[in-house]
Amino acid sequence: IITDPVFEKNYGPLWFGPKKYVESPLTLKELPEINLFLLTHNHYDHMSIRTIKNFPYKNAEVLVPLKLGKYFTRNGYKKDKVKEMDWFDTIKINDDIKVTMIPAQHWSKRWIWGDGNTDRSLWGSFLIEYKGKKIFFACDTGPAPFYKDLGEKFGPIDLGFGNIGAYNFFPIINEKDKSVFHTNPEELLSLMQDLKVKKVIGMHWGTAILSLEPIWEPPV
């Protein structure tokens, strides 16, 4: 399973954009066989057209939010393997694995200039169920009251991955270390408690400068 892969050295439409401080540990050619490709949303630090084009396992099952399937089918992926999902849709991959897309407090936009493409495609987190175990892979998300309802519906969850970086946009956002669309470490733990997640791994930090907090601050 691979999630939101970006194998380029920077996030952006061309050669420019935030540069990675930490490069990918593998190249595309070094990837082991991938059977399931999950994409949470279309922001440049999560969806790379170059990675999609050059991905070596185009027979993999691909699960994406609504309106993002075209980026795969036009780049050589089989149409019957690319499935767009709405919130609360569940897809059975095989007898052992099923995947549900669940809501996130986020947004979508592909082009930098103008607002014409804002929220034209969906975004969402993934709940992966495998032989009685549940793994939550979060889309970028801010805190939201609906996570308590999701915890009642889907919990308990064995393992959760969630963002702990890109939370300081002060003074663009009035309150320092608070973001509507991302969580700081303390907010992530609260969110995961609402979801009834047993163990949590913080991600989405230390790779590139996407906001105003020091890049290595989140785990501190």
Outline where the language-model segments fall:
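Pre-active-site segment of Zn-dependent metallo-hydrolases
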Residues: I2-N42, I49-N54, S108-T118, A144-G155
